[in-house]
Amino acid sequence: MTDPIPSAGETTIIGLPAIQIPITTTGDRPLTQEDIETIARLAPGTALLISTRGAVSGSRYLLDEDEVTVGRDSRADILLYDSTVSRSHAVFRRVGDTFVVYDSGSLNGTYVNRQRVDHQQLRNGDEIMIGKFRLVFFTKSAVIA
C-alpha cells in the first residue's frame, strides 16, 4: 500500500539485509486516514507538507506552484510566525517532477533529515526543519503502490 523509504544500501554495516520501511508516519505522529487520503488525491507535479511540530502541528501545506516561500513575513506563502524563523527563511521550488528546498540565507538554517542544507532535493518522508517547526514532505507516490 505504501512505498518503502529508500535505504542507504542493500546491506547494513554488519552485513544483514537492509529493511524497507513503509511511510506510515510523519515523524512525531502516525499518518491519519485523512492524511493518507489527501496524499492519494494529490495532482501530478504537486506535493504536500504536513506539520508535525510547532504551533501549526497537524497543518497541511500544498506545494502546487513552481515556487513556494516560507518565513515569518506576512507575504510568505507559508507563514510560520515564530522568532526561530527568519522573515524570508526558505523556498520550495519545483524542478522538473521533483521539489528542492533552498535556504534563503536564514539565521537558524534549514534542515532536511536533521542535516543543515543550503538546498536539497526532497523525497517522500523527508523531514524539513525550519526554526522549531517540522514539516514532512509527501508526493502521491508515498501512498500509491
Q: Which ranges hold each PLM region?
A:
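Intrinsically disordered, low-complexity acidic Ser/Thr-rich regulatory segments
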Residues: 1-80, 143-145
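Residue-level signal for short segments within beta-strands and strand-turn junctions
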Residues: 51-53, 94, 139
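Forkhead-associated
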Residues: 57-134
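Short, Lys/Arg- and Gly-enriched loop/turn segments at beta-strand edges
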Residues: 135-143
